[in-house]
Amino acid sequence: MSKTPLSIAHPWHGPVLTRDDYESLCCYIEITPADSVKFELDKETGILKVDRPQKFSNFCPCLYGLLPKTYCGDLSGEYSGQQSNRENIKGDGDPLDICVLTEKNITQGNILLQARPIGGIRILDSEEADDKIIAVLEDDLVYGNIEDISECPGTVLDMIQHYFLTYKATPESLIQAKPAKIEIVGLYGKKEAQKVIRLAHEDYCNLFM
């Protein structure tokens, strides 16, 4: 009997993103609030790698990762530019990022979970679209009933926005008030989040299929 080599599906290319028109999403988690190291999926191998230690006091306040079979390319960049009233905005060339809210103490990354999108944060990083979709863990006892970002506690959204505004900043740049490369254009709700996801999924299909 011949032996079949064992293989593991690539977290970016293997899982099915959605089976119900973006109401529920498969999410790959890279970072948890317990991590003092920034982990990142290696796009070539599909292995979770150390990107860099967290240099300063910033810790991601939520589960953070990516959406399988998404890519921030031309369609994503064009839409971000339209909504931001900016020209020449491009996609950042990465899978679409996702932040997952849960009251559970999940301390391990490199996992898949199901979450429902409730909105997103429109971010420009060096004039590239770098949106963060906000979602809630399915059946979560605290966040599970939230349907739209407008129902999310403001303090939670403030913490997430503060993290992404400052996690790349140095104390020197903050003290000297140097212009930030990262800009939060605004928040948007569930319906627009689903459109952002759909465009990123189309970008992925255009690139890989």
UniProtKB/Swiss-Prot annotation:
Statement: the UniProt record of this protein carries the keyword Hydrolase: yes
Binding site for Mg(2+) 1: D92, D97, D130
Binding site for Mg(2+) 2: D97
Annotated Gene Ontology cellular component terms: cytosol
SUPFAM superfamilies in the cross-refs: Inorganic pyrophosphatase
Principal localisation: cytoplasm
Pfam families recorded: Pyrophosphatase
GO BP term (any one): phosphate-containing compound metabolic process
Gene3D superfamilies: Inorganic pyrophosphatase
Keywords carried by this UniProt record: Cytoplasm, Hydrolase, Magnesium, Metal-binding
Listed transmembrane segments: none
Cofactor(s) needed for function: Mg(2+)
Location relative to the cell: Cytoplasm
GO molecular function, a single term: inorganic diphosphate phosphatase activity
Residues binding substrate, per UniProt: K38, R52, Y64, Y167
This enzyme's EC code(s): 3.6.1.1
Catalytic reactions on record: diphosphate + H2O = 2 phosphate + H(+)
Family recorded in the similarity comment: Belongs to the PPase family.
Record text on subunit structure and interactions: Homohexamer.
Role this protein plays: Catalyzes the hydrolysis of inorganic pyrophosphate (PPi) forming two phosphate ions.
Name of the protein this chain belongs to: Inorganic pyrophosphatase
Protein species of origin: Chlamydia trachomatis serovar D (strain ATCC VR-885 / DSM 19411 / UW-3/Cx)
Lineage: Bacteria, Pseudomonadati, Chlamydiota, Chlamydiia, Chlamydiales
